[in-house]
Every structure is written in C-alpha cells, then in structure tokens.
C-alpha cells in the first residue's frame, strides 16, 4: 500500500519512535571462522573458498581462536558479561548465498550479553538542540559466519526480483562476524536519527581502537540493520517494527531512521497496520522498499551445532583480556582534547584517518600536537592515499616525524625542505639526519650569503623596489620568491623578508 509520507517533525510530535540497531562486524582475522581460507577483501570471485565454507559433505568446522578472542574483547569493551559457557547453533534457511542451507551462529547462548555504551550525541547544526549523552543498552554480541555475496544481473532494482540471472561469490562465506544487538532505544524522541548515527559512530570508534576490524562501511565490513517502530506515547506497548537491512554509512543510518519514522506515521495515520518486514535501503533515492515479511526466530528452526563443542572461556584469560583493553575512545578524546586543545572535529578526522595513535606517539617523541597533527593528517595522509595503504604502513614512524618537526621548529629546515627530506626517508635513503646530510637540505644560516642573494635580486628589479618604497609592502613577496630560488629553497623566508625590507629602506 502506498501512502503519502508524513513530515518528520509532525510524525515525532504525534508518535514516539523506538529504535533497535543490529550491527554486523567483519573481524580482521587472517582466516575464516571455521576453516583456513584467507579473508582478503577484493580477491577474484570464488578464489577464497574451501570444503567447509562451501558446505561439501564430510567437511568439519574448527573454531578460529583469534575470532573468539576478538569477540570476547568486543564484549568487554562494551561492558558486557562474558558467558561462562556458550555454544553455536544452526540457523536454517535456504538461499543461494549460504551453500550449507544453514548459517552457523549463536542463538540462545551468545558469547557476550547485558552491556552498554555511553554515546555522546552532538548538538544540532543550527544549535537549537543541545548535546547530550545517551546510554545504549546492549542485549547481546554473538559470533556467526558471514554469507556469500549475490550479484543480481538485469532488472531495474539490483534485487533478485526481476533479475535475468544471479551470480554468487562465496569468498565472503564463512568470514567471522560479530553481531551486536541493542535493546530498544527508548526516549530518543525527535533526536532518534541523531542517536542512531552517534551510536554507530561511537561503536565504530570502539572497534577501531580494539583493532578487531577495519570497520569500512563502504566495503561491508561494518553493516547496520535499523529496526524501528512507533507508538502513541512512551507509556504505550511497542509497535510493530520494520527492519531496514544493510545500511552502509553513518549518514544513511540517520536518513533511514528519518524516512522510516515518516513512513510508519503515514501508515498509522491512514488507519492501516504496519507490516513486520525487512526493507531495502536505497542510497540514491533515500527511500526504503519492501523486501520480505520478517521471520521470527522459530521460523529458522535453530538447533545446537553438533559439529562444534561448547565454548567455556577460561576466566583468568578473560580477565587478562580485560586488563589489556585500550583506553575507551570517548575517554581518550576528552583527555587529548584537554591536553592538546583539538576540537572534536579535528580529533574525529584523526581517528577516521587511523592517525590518532601515530599522532600521540609523535607527541611523545617530542613534537608539538599541532605539528604532529599537521604532518600525519597532511603530507603523510596524502602519500598514504596516493599509495593506497594505511598510514601505519608507510616507511616512516613517529620518531622520524618528530625529528622533522624539530628541525623545522629550530629553523634548520623549511617546510619545503622538510617535505623533501620526508620523500627521501620514504624512498629508503636512510634516516632523517642521513637524508638531510646526503641531499644537503639544511637551511643556509650565513647572512652573508643571504645578503648577496638579496642584493642581486634587488638590483635586477628596480621597479619592484620603487613599489615597495611607495608603500606597497606586499610587492616584496615577488622578491622573496626570487631570493628563495637563488638559494635553491635553502633559506628562511621570514629572514629573507627582513633583509629585503631593510635594504629597500
């Protein structure tokens, strides 16, 4: 049934939205959850498969120990209780992307449960709605294997309905997943989209700090399902929910919530009933479309996985993992904000670039926070992007960057010379000191040489000299550039400017 959408502000004035978020996280293990196939993203289709992930007769699963460790660390970071005993179950359904006709998951015995994550929700852009902290209650975090990836060819929607044929890539089948499920998020009111976005962003920061996933939403290593229902008042029973699947960006999470609130309100206003269903999010249009009626747990006929023994984590090991957890990102952000004076946006940019650890290590090596941030988010970030690698993979470390920053601060290198020295280090020519010496990059400190270059340029540009004497001091910029050229860039521009203005009079 098609109905005209209700304006979002009208919808939240009339109804109380209740959210539930399910986030699927691909773990960055080297091999799959129950087999030894690699997990590299972007490999040729169906080249990272094996008898277990293809469900061939006689293939037996073996649990990936690293995946279990990552699952426990995630649970601990989300303030969850860790199960003293848990087990896997078979989730039975038929679909081409799961060749076994069941998914190995956890049903009634998850590895982690009853946690929470405090989320800082920022003020609205127009400043009319203040910032606040919302505690998201975590119902469970459970382990499961990912499915294969379907490609539906032909048709107008990219979905299986109307497609001429479908292709399946089983490289993803069996990759370790953690599904993190919230309890209903109540009391969010008109800020429901902001809370949803802030939660996924905060969760992504936690996962990144644990180094358990690359959390690249655009590659599907972090996928969000948005459950939403409306009710007349906060005291009313929960309404019928819809589930919007595989929302793959923070902005889309926010937009999907807004759209579904407006759609649910329109359905309820019309006197119809909301259908419990899964829906597809369309990034290009900002709309959701119906997928299928939502199955209940009993429809999957869960039963214990007979080929895997129960998991009984050693409690001493769990406590060791707890003690080794990194500082929570929100706490770290507040600490560094106080120590460094960075804005939340600047901090977020460093986190998203994977640079925060490198910046902190560079500061510890002696650089100022501003200089460390400038290098890692500027020149080095551009180089990493150009090479298609992570910042941490570059052949330069925090100590090198701190040394470059110190040389610039001391006036021994200009910014341009420091960039040239960096190129040498990245090219494997040696340490910063070795590259500076080999390339002769040190700034000329001899005023005699600088004065000679300045006088040569002044003599060649009498018209510019007259402009400066006539009050146009900005004309000195052209002369400074020529002097720098004479000095092959090995001079301090500020000192050259002083000498030019002294001699012009």
From Swiss-Prot:
What enzyme class is recorded for this protein?
ligase
Q: What is this protein called?
A: Aspartyl/glutamyl-tRNA(Asn/Gln) amidotransferase subunit B
| Its EC number(s) | 6.3.5.-
Function per UniProt: Allows the formation of correctly charged Asn-tRNA(Asn) or Gln-tRNA(Gln) through the transamidation of misacylated Asp-tRNA(Asn) or Glu-tRNA(Gln) in organisms which lack either or both of asparaginyl-tRNA or glutaminyl-tRNA synthetases. The reaction takes place in the presence of glutamine and ATP through an activated phospho-Asp-tRNA(Asn) or phospho-Glu-tRNA(Gln).
Q: Which HAMAP family match?
A: GatB
Quickly give the catalysed reaction.
L-glutamyl-tRNA(Gln) + L-glutamine + ATP + H2O = L-glutaminyl-tRNA(Gln) + L-glutamate + ADP + phosphate + H(+); L-aspartyl-tRNA(Asn) + L-glutamine + ATP + H2O = L-asparaginyl-tRNA(Asn) + L-glutamate + ADP + phosphate + 2 H(+)
Q: Does the keyword Protein biosynthesis apply?
A: yes
Q: What species is this protein from? A: Kineococcus radiotolerans (strain ATCC BAA-149 / DSM 14245 / SRS30216)
Question: Which Gene3D superfamilies does the record cross-reference, listed alphabetically?
Answer: 1.10.10.410
Q: Report the sequence similarity comment from the record.
A: Belongs to the GatB/GatE family. GatB subfamily.
User: What Pfam families does this protein map onto?
Assistant: GatB_N (PF02934), GatB_Yqey (PF02637)
What are the GO BP annotations of this UniProt entry?
glutaminyl-tRNAGln biosynthesis via transamidation; translation
List the Gene Ontology MF annotations in alphabetical order: asparaginyl-tRNA synthase (glutamine-hydrolyzing) activity; ATP binding; glutaminyl-tRNA synthase (glutamine-hydrolyzing) activity
Q: Which UniProt keywords apply?
A: ATP-binding, Ligase, Nucleotide-binding, Protein biosynthesis
Q: What's the subunit arrangement here?
A: Heterotrimer of A, B and C subunits.
In terms of InterPro entries, this protein maps to:
Asn/Gln-tRNA_amidoTrfase_suB/E, Asn/Gln-tRNA_Trfase_suB/E_cat, Asn/Gln_amidotransferase, Asn/Gln_tRNA_amidoTrase-B-like, GatB, GatB_Yqey_C_2, Gln-tRNA_amidoTrfase_suB_CS, Gln_synth/guanido_kin_cat_dom
